[in-house]
């Protein structure tokens, strides 16, 4: 496996085939997925107070609500109808459809259950500047880079089910203000994420046909892990270390 810098693969050995590409992607997840971040360790281990959990859910809403926007941009990159049809359900997963609840509504159940006003959450007025910068950078990435890289950047979902299971179990066990109903977003993603990643992984393995394209796929995944990690860095700095920037959400009693 090539060495990694903070932003890219950095080594001389090219990835020779699709199997080597998949192995490299999985190693990136093992080394860099945000389940390893100290903030998640605190969150899942019951070490945060309610205000800190509120801050996490509030900021994460901006990411969740931007996912269907990102996916609409991905769809716009493809002339191939079959790819657009396959990707379209991701928008419905988060936005919902007529008569069906989507992931954004489930996330608002979480924030409401934690005592946050939904209007305030949806306004995104209280989120950290770094949250906005990181999420917007992700939307811009899928707009500006190749369609192959746009799809590759979604592959953090390969590693999400284990994180969701850890989150459900840990938060239900440790926080008396959390119940199964408000954790419904994560339960639903346990079913949705594997379906999404099956297609995305097949796509990049099939369409990344040169060493340069395989490296670009890996670097797209590294970029996405940085997007996720940077959001948690900002949360930790603001709500664990106590350096809340002006204008951001301040929990009661903080």
UniProtKB/Swiss-Prot annotation:
Q: Which reaction does it catalyse?
A: 6-(2-amino-2-carboxyethyl)-7,8-dioxo-1,2,3,4,7,8-hexahydroquinoline-2,4-dicarboxylate + 3 O2 = pyrroloquinoline quinone + 2 H2O2 + 2 H2O + H(+)
Stored InterPro entries: Haem_Oase-like_multi-hlx (IPR016084), PqqC (IPR011845), PqqC-like (IPR039068), Thiaminase-2/PQQC (IPR004305)
Pfam families (alphabetical): TENA_THI-4
Q: In which pathway does it act?
A: Cofactor biosynthesis; pyrroloquinoline quinone biosynthesis
EC number annotated for this UniProt entry:
1.3.3.11
Tell me the keywords, alphabetical order: Oxidoreductase, PQQ biosynthesis
Enzyme class, one word?
Answer: oxidoreductase
Q: Which GO terms describe its molecular function?
A: pyrroloquinoline-quinone synthase activity
Question: Which BP terms in the Gene Ontology apply to this protein?
Answer: pyrroloquinoline quinone biosynthetic process; sulfur compound metabolic process
Q: NCBIfam families per the record? A: PQQ_syn_pqqC (TIGR02111)
Q: Which family does it belong to?
A: Belongs to the PqqC family.
Protein function: Ring cyclization and eight-electron oxidation of 3a-(2-amino-2-carboxyethyl)-4,5-dioxo-4,5,6,7,8,9-hexahydroquinoline-7,9-dicarboxylic-acid to PQQ.
**Name this polypeptide is given:** Pyrroloquinoline-quinone synthase
Q: Which organism is it from?
A: Rhodopseudomonas palustris (strain TIE-1)
Name the gene for this chain. pqqC
């Amino acid at each position: 496996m090539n060495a990694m810098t903070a932003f890219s693969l950095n080594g001389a050995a090219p990835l020779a085939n699709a199997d080597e590409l998949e192995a490299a992607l999985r190693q990136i997840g093992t080394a860099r997925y945000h389940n390893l971040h100290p903030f998640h360790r605190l969150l899942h281990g019951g070490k945060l107070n309610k205000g800190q959990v509120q801050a996490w859910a509030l900021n994460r809403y901006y990411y969740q609500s931007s996912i269907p926007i990102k996916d609409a941009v991905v769809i716009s990159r493809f002339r191939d109808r079959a790819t657009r049809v396959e990707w379209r359900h991701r928008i419905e997963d988060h936005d919902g459809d007529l008569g069906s609840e989507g992931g954004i509504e489930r996330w608002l159940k979480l924030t409401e259950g934690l005592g946050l006003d939904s209007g305030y959450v949806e306004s995104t007025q209280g989120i950290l500047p770094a949250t906005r910068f990181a999420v917007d950078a992700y939307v811009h990435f899928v707009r500006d880079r190749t369609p192959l890289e746009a799809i590759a950047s979604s592959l953090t979902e390969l590693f999400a089910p284990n994180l969701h299971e850890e989150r459900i179990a840990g938060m239900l066990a440790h926080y008396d203000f959390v119940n199964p109903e408000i954790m419904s977003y994560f339960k639903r993603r346990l079913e949705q994420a594997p379906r999404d990643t099956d297609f995305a992984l097949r796509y990049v393995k099939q369409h990344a046909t040169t060493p340069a394209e395989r490296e670009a796929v890996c670097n797209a995944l590294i970029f996405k892990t940085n997007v996720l990690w940077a959001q948690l860095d900002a949360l930790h700095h603001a709500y664990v270390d106590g350096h809340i920037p002006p204008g951001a959400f301040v929990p009661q009693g903080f």
